[in-house]
């Protein structure tokens, strides 16, 4: 029988789970709860004694030392009077009040950093007589020093504080190893900013990373960023197969852990390139799961930090360090270009700066060099670990010249930019067999998509020219310009659909989304095109791409979404009476993309190399006039002179043989006012830049 004076242990209660508490919704306290089960996320139950409420908070009760549930113990000497006990209580209440005010002010976006630093210093000024060493260390760990470069003031951690449970996904060795393997399969081939062998020795074999000390903040941030990027690249099927959990739960945990590690790494003032690598991976991963403007805003920090670390320079560095710096800088340039297109807005890095600093890394495999490499290594021919990334670097350089260079309004200059881009990128496909590996297949089709995109950008650039501008407008492609432009846009949309339907593209689907520019071109060309056969082929592709874009980027630029929605409504309204017998144009918002692949002309498996030249869907079979044109235009990057690709034609796949001498812009006639195709694109760009245009709308005529 218990003694009368002995305190009874407070029973453990089943409280609201973590997710319901954060979302501030009522939890039924089941295991798992109904809210988490319906949302498809992992339910984290909370079981602990209930905290005192109301008047009970004011009472000082001595907690039994053997009580394992006790989290705070305050001992008042028996010899002390009532006044001493009251003084201790008042002092503790004051510290709690100041700590709560500090937390509330940190959540406010308008808080002052200096005031927070002073408050945090005041709170942790504790004497040994007041709290023991363990309590003091707990306060020090819970204090966030914003003056040291913490990112909580930027809102990376969301509305709630950090939870120790979120970092367990990184500390779990088995999970981190699996996520690293996913990263090496899905992310590393397309975002090449890390040295693959060094990452394998570090995360898979347990060695130190590039000479850093154990538990270095920069290395911890990089490991968390790798796990976060890997989590976002998973498909739902892969997530269940590997982790027996939904993708959303894995991504949420990995993101919290990554943001916590970035806060501890002092990103804003850190001199380590590794910390910036972690932040860039964070931006890449967040951009794939979060269509809001967050990444577009945070890109300014990445660009500033890169310039502060002198990434474009670094001539005195070792060969290994030079390669890593070049990869990181050009990846930042690529992200800057991609985020500027998604809003749309001007890139942070100007065309002149991106061109002058364009120094691509070596086209080699990661196994060809290491941290101890003391000499340069020559470029390799054929497919390497860096082939796709090298093409991406050239894409952002050419894309800036075609879309954001104000002086490039002459058709010959634009033609030269496209030709130089094709020469540089197609050279990287020497001996590439698309049937060898999923990476080779993906690189093969994406490069064709990039070449088509460059040609489309030359014909329909993003530069907005108001009427009355002194610049020369782009001439029509040819007498059947609308059909040719529509074919270019359709090819891009089909290639995107191919990646999302072919099993070999499963690991890279996170990286490929429907680009709004080709989609807008395709919709506007469907409105003005007179070829009914081409329209019948195009509409299912356009409809599927529109629904996929609408579902994937909800929450992104309102101007883009509104413009595409308006264009699609006008096309459906105009073409429904004439094509209702062959295709339905009244698709509901729940349009199923899975029903579309049967109508696409893109094959799900690439043709054999013996029959590849007979495929009518390939770019090499498209009619492109080829009048003579001088090749003395400016280089894309003015960094290295590329040898003419015609000198090595015997090394190219037959698919690419006809691309050497093809021209993008043909026809010498000036643009006529009745060119409905160009007028339609002008209205699209005007709607993006000016909102609702006040000019006469041809889509309403």
UniProtKB/Swiss-Prot annotation:
SUPFAM superfamilies of this UniProt entry? Zn2/Cys6 DNA-binding domain
- Per the record, DNA-binding region residues lie at 17-43
- Tell me one GO molecular function of this protein: DNA-binding transcription factor activity, RNA polymerase II-specific
Where does the secretion signal sit in this chain?
Answer: none
Specify the protein name.
C6 finger domain transcription factor nscR
Species the sequence originates in: Arthroderma gypseum (strain ATCC MYA-4604 / CBS 118893) (Microsporum gypseum)
**Its function?**
Transcription factor that specifically regulates the neosartoricin B biosynthesis gene cluster.
**InterPro entries found in the cross-reference section:** Sec_Metabolite_Reg, Transcription_factor_dom_fun, Zn2-C6_fun-type_DNA-bd_sf, Zn2Cys6_DnaBD
Listed A to Z, the keywords are: DNA-binding, Metal-binding, Nucleus, Transcription, Transcription regulation, Zinc
State its location(s). Nucleus
Where does the source fall among the domains of life?
Eukaryota
What is one cellular component GO term in this UniProt entry?
A: nucleus
Q: Does the keyword Metal-binding apply?
A: yes
| Keyword Zinc in annotation | yes
Q: Check the record and name the Pfam families matching this protein.
A: Fungal_trans, Zn_clus
Q: What does the record list as GO biological process?
A: DNA-templated transcription
The coding gene here is nscR
């Amino acid at each position: 029988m218990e003694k009368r004076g002995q305190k009874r242990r407070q029973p453990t209660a089943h409280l609201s789970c973590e997710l319901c508490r954060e979302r501030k919704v009522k939890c039924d306290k089941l295991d798992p709860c109904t809210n988490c089960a319906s949302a498809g996320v992992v339910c984290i139950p909370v079981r602990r004694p209930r905290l005192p409420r109301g008047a009970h908070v004011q009472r000082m009760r001595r907690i039994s030392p053997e009580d394992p549930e006790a989290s705070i113990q305050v001992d008042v000497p028996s010899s002390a009077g009532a006044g001493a006990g009251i003084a201790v209580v008042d002092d503790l209440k004051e510290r709690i009040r100041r700590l709560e005010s500090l937390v509330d002010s940190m959540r406010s976006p308008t808080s002052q950093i200096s005031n927070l630093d002073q408050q945090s210093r005041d709170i942790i000024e504790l004497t040994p007589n007041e709290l023991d060493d363990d309590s003091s260390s707990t306060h020090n760990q819970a204090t966030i020093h914003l003056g040291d470069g913490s990112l909580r003031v930027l809102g990376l951690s969301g509305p709630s504080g950090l939870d120790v449970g979120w970092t367990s996904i990184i500390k779990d060795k088995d999970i981190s190893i699996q996520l690293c393997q996913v990263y090496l399969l899905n992310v590393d081939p397309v975002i090449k900013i890390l040295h693959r062998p060094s990452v394998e020795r570090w995360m898979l074999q347990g060695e130190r990373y590039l000479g850093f000390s154990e538990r270095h903040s920069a290395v911890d941030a990089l490991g968390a960023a790798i796990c976060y990027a890997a989590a976002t690249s998973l498909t739902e099927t892969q997530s269940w197969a590997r982790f027996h959990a939904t993708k959303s739960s894995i991504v949420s945990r990995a993101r919290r852990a990554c943001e916590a590690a970035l806060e501890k790494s002092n990103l804003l003032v850190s001199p380590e390139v590794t910390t910036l690598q972690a932040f860039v991976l964070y931006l890449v991963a967040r951009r794939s799961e979060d269509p809001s403007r967050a990444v577009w805003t945070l890109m300014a920090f990445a660009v500033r930090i890169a310039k502060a670390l002198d990434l474009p320079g670094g001539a005195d560095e070792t060969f290994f360090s030079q390669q890593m710096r070049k990869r990181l800088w050009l990846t930042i340039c690529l992200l800057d270009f991609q985020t500027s297109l998604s809003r749309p807005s001007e890139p942070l890095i100007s065309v002149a700066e991106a061109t002058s600093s364009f120094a691509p890394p070596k086209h080699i495999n990661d196994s060809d060099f290491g941290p101890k490499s003391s000499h340069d290594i020559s470029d390799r021919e054929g497919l390497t670990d860096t082939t796709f990334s090298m093409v991406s670097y050239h894409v952002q350089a050419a894309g800036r010249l075609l879309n954001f260079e104000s002086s490039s309004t002459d058709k010959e200059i634009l033609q030269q930019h496209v030709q130089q881009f094709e020469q540089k990128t197609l050279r990287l496909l020497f001996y590439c067999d698309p049937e060898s590996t999923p990476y080779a297949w993906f690189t093969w089709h994406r490069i064709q998509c990039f070449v088509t995109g460059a040609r489309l950008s030359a014909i329909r650039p993003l530069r907005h020219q108001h009427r009355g501008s002194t610049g020369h407008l782009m001439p029509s492609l040819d007498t059947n310009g609308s059909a040719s432009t529509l074919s270019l846009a359709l090819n891009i949309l089909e290639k995107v659909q191919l990646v999302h339907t072919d099993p070999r593209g499963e690991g890279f689907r996170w990286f490929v989304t429907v680009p709004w520019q080709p989609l807008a071109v395709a919709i506007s060309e469907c409105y003005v095109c007179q070829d009914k056969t081409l329209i019948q082929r195009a509409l299912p592709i356009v409809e599927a791409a529109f629904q996929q874009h609408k579902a994937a980027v909800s929450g992104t630029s309102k101007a883009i979404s509104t413009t595409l929605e308006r264009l699609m409504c006008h096309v459906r309204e105009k073409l429904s009476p004439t094509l209702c017998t062959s295709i339905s144009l009244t698709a509901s918002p729940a349009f199923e993309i899975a029903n579309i692949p049967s109508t696409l002309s893109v094959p799900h498996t690439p043709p054999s190399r013996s029959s590849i030249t007979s495929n009518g869907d390939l770019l090499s079979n498209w009619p492109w006039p080829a009048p003579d044109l001088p090749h003395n235009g400016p280089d894309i990057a003015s960094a290295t002179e590329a040898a003419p690709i015609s000198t090595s034609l015997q090394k190219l796949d037959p698919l690419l043989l006809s691309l050497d001498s093809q021209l993008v812009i043909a026809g010498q006639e000036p643009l006529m006012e009745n060119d409905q195709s160009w007028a339609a694109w002008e209205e699209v760009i005007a709607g993006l830049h000016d909102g609702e245009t006040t000019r006469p709308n041809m889509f309403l005529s």
